[in-house]
A protein has these predicted regions:
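Core alpha/beta nucleotide-donor-binding catalytic domains of modification enzymes
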Residues: 1-25, 29-165, 169
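Single conserved hydrophobic/aromatic residue that forms the stacking wall/gate
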Residues: 166-178
Length: 178
């Protein structure tokens, strides 16, 4: 699978030499598979890898365990890791938004803060998020129900947005965990 993902990254010009890749890692199987693959590809593509973990303040002890797990793996694999903590339920009430929307806002803020710490041009900073084919299908159906246009039906593109948002999206969930 690593060979296919390397080809996919090169074909879509997702990571360039000397880029900084900020990997969003939740501790779930998809993001851990992505992190393992990025760690393996780091030497082949010559980029700097950093992990961003976001504690949303929603799932209590379970979220605390996810944070510890991610921090321990990063320490073991010698990958710099920054944890951003937010009180998403409190912010949702304050901002009068749903928790899902508030979560999107704080995640974007966390990546912008981490990108600023890197001291590089935006074009040299990539944000990697793990999505599998099931996630893509779910996003497409959600967008269709919302009455989206053609752009929304395209779901998640491999590289998108201000800081080159990377979606590692080729494997299915089963392939990612095997």
């Amino acid at each position: 699978m690593e060979r296919e993902i390397l080809a996919y990254i090169k074909q879509n010009r997702m990571i360039g030499k000397n880029d900084v890749v900020l990997a969003g890692v939740s501790g779930g199987s998809d993001s851990m598979a992505m992190l393992r693959i990025l760690k393996e590809l780091q030497g082949k593509l010559d980029f700097t890898l950093r992990v961003v973990h976001i504690h949303h303040g929603i799932r209590g002890k379970e979220a605390d365990r996810d944070q510890s797990f991610v921090e321990n793996i990063c320490r073991k694999w010698q990958i710099p890791c920054t944890v951003y903590c937010y009180d998403v339920p409190g912010l949702s009430r304050e901002w009068k938004l749903g928790e899902e929307e508030t979560g999107r806002i704080v995640r974007k803020e966390a990546f912008q803060r981490e990108a600023a710490v890197c001291g590089r041009k935006d074009s040299e900073i990539k944000i990697a998020l793990a999505h599998n084919q099931e996630d893509l299908a779910e996003t497409m159906l959600h967008n269709l129900c919302r009455g989206t246009g053609l752009r929304g039906l395209c779901t998640m593109r491999p590289v998108d947005g201000e800081l080159s948002l990377i979606h590692i999206s080729e494997p299915t969930r089963q392939e990612a965990i095997s």
